[in-house]
């Protein structure tokens, strides 16, 4: 028993000894408030730029006195009290000053030198192919003037160097290639490669917008994960010239399902990242908006934003007249705002944003469409609204303003019109009033053309107009972007009323015999043509005014 007590005492003593061991503390070294400095660019005319090659004056303003050590973040150091330094490469640098054992740091961003290009025509004339000459001006803000730049210009195919007829290639080496003409319509991209002091700078590109000699209408379209593009509907391009799209330099957005053109303004309806069902429990997943873009892409304004609100209220589809811009959400109804309004934030508590029409305010509700029937394109023709649905009662439905109920309808008993293409996935349609034809695209089937006379005859007997094969004029299949009942499909169609042509963007299904691109249904030849190939378009719009450029 005594032995056990001794063992226990030994254990306690060992534990006590181990508890007395001291660990070395960890010391953190922090910048001192007593050490400070400022810096500025001394090159005249470059004071705000902080470019590669700039002379930067560092000034010690510390409260402490003593020997100074500067570390400039690029591996260079100095022990001068107030040194100057030049950075040879762009980047974010951490500058450190140590005085008497204390230190401080400050970040310094050095920007790279990059030339700028300006393209000009005499008297600011519109540049058209094979005629109007373009001159280029290059500016290089280079604080280290001793280093001379070397320029190489890469010009687009079809460029003629008027002042250098001996050059037949698309490359010019020198400060300025002189006067240029272009033989192809569209955005002609010029690339400038610059070497300065033996170092290659970032390539600079300039788009010269080259128009057509034949005044033509302009077709706009939004490219998936790309930009807003424009295309001249000129089918009489001179031999040897090509007609390519214009890049407006404006991002299309996440899902710009509809474009609307009115009074020289292109309205872009982008329903945002989330366009299919989502459990938006916090009602804050919305990120859709309507943007007004100048016809040449030179400016843009926010018309309406739903950012931070309910996702299902994002603007999906639209229609515009001389006074109002109408926009449909995902599956509830259509709202409207003035065409000239800007910088609006959608607020469903504000009576200004009350619905113009809702699913449950028409006699179609519950008979045949259901709660939350998915919206699609809509239009007003000769005083009558046409509204496409893709799910929960697919088809095209019609109503007049007077058919809109002022109270909710639990189940409709007297629909105002028979249905066009009942139970079909109809995302887009357009009506040719001159030739009295309704064109519509049905998913997995293709383009249908229905004489309005047939629809009127069916209306007289209260019979739905079905998607009979006799109306199918072109077969194709879209990709599966989206989900069941909410596929993006062909999301918009436009009509050129002057010749009856119908245009739309097709993102073809993989393996489809009909390629992706901007399509034209030519009623004269009854053929589906590819106008612009190799693009994945969403919304599309037409400027009916003819011009050489935009």
Go through the PLM ranges and name each one.
Residues 20-216:
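Extracellular/lumenal mature domains of secreted and surface-exposed proteins
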Residues 218-222, 265-268, 324-328, 384-388, ...:
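Conserved beta-propeller blade signature
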Residues 225-227, 272-277, 331-334, 391-394, ...:
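Short glycine/acidic-enriched loop and turn motifs that connect beta-strands
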Residues 227-229, 286-291, 333-336, 394-398, ...:
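A short loop-to-beta-strand structural motif that recurs across blades of beta-propeller domains
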Residues 232-238, 293-295, 337-347, 399-408, ...:
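Short loop/turn segments immediately following beta-strands, especially the blade-tip
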Residues 238-251, 299-308, 345-367, 405-421, ...:
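A short beta-strand motif characteristic of beta-propeller blades
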Residues 253-263, 310-322, 361-381, 422-434, ...:
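Repeated scaffold domains used in trafficking and secretory/extracellular systems
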Residues 513-550:
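Blade-level signature of beta-propeller repeat domains, shared across WD40, Kelch, NHL, RCC1
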């Amino acid at each position: 028993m005594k032995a056990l007590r001794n063992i226990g005492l030994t254990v306690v003593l060992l534990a006590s000894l181990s508890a007395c061991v001291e660990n070395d503390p960890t010391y953190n070294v922090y910048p001192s408030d007593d050490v400070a400095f400022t810096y500025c660019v001394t090159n005249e005319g470059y004071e705000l730029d902080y470019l590669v090659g700039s002379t930067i004056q560092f000034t010690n303003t510390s409260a402490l006195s003593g020997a100074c050590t500067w570390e400039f973040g690029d591996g260079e150091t100095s022990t001068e009290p107030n040194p100057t330094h030049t950075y040879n490469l762009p980047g974010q640098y951490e500058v450190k000053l140590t005085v008497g054992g204390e230190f401080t740091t400050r970040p310094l961003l050095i920007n790279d030198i990059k030339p700028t290009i300006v393209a000009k025509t005499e008297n600011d004339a519109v540049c058209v192919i094979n005629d109007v000459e373009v001159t280029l001006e290059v500016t290089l803000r280079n604080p280290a003037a001793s280093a001379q730049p070397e320029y190489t210009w890469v010009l687009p195919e079809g460029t003629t160097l008027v002042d250098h007829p001996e050059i037949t290639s698309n490359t010019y080496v020198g400060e300025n290639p002189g006067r240029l003409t272009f033989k192809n319509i569209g955005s002609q991209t010029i690339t400038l490669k610059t070497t300065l002091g033996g170092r290659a700078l970032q390539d600079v590109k300039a788009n010269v917008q080259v128009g057509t000699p034949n005044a033509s209408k302009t077709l706009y379209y939004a490219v998936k994960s790309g930009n807003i593009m424009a295309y001249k509907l000129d089918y009489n391009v001179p031999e040897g010239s090509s007609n390519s799209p214009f890049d407006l330099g404006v991002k299309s957005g996440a899902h710009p399902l509809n474009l609307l053109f009115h009074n020289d303004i292109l309205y872009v309806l982008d329903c945002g990242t989330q366009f299919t069902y989502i459990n938006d429990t916090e009602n804050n997943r919305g990120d859709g908006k309507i943007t007004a873009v100048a016809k040449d892409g030179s400016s843009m304004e926010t018309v309406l934003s739903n950012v931070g609100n309910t996702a299902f209220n994002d603007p999906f589809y639209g229609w515009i007249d001389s006074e109002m811009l109408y926009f449909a959400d995902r599956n509830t109804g259509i709202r409207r705002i003035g065409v000239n309004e800007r910088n609006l934030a959608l607020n469903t508590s504000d009576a200004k944003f009350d619905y113009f029409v809702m699913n449950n305010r028409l006699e179609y509700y519950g008979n045949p469409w259901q709660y939350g029937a998915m919206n699609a394109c809509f239009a007003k023709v000769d005083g009558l609204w046409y509204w496409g649905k893709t799910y929960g009662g697919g088809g095209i439905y019609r109503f007049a303003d007077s058919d809109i109920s002022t109270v909710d309808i639990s189940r409709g008993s007297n629909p105002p019109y028979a249905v066009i293409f009942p139970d079909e996935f109809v995302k887009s349609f357009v009506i040719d009033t001159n030739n009295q034809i309704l064109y519509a695209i049905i998913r997995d089937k293709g383009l249908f053309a229905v004489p309005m006379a047939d629809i009127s005859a069916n209306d007289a007997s209260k019979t739905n107009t079905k998607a009979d094969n006799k109306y199918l004029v072109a077969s194709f299949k879209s990709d599966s972007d989206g989900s069941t009942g909410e596929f993006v499909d062909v999301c918009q169609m436009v009509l050129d009323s002057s010749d009856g042509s119908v245009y739309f963007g097709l993102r073809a299904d993989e393996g489809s015999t009909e390629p992706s691109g901007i399509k034209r249904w030519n009623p004269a030849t009854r053929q589906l043509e590819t106008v612009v190939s190799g693009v994945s378009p969403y919304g599309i719009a037409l400027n009916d005014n003819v011009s050489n450029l935009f």
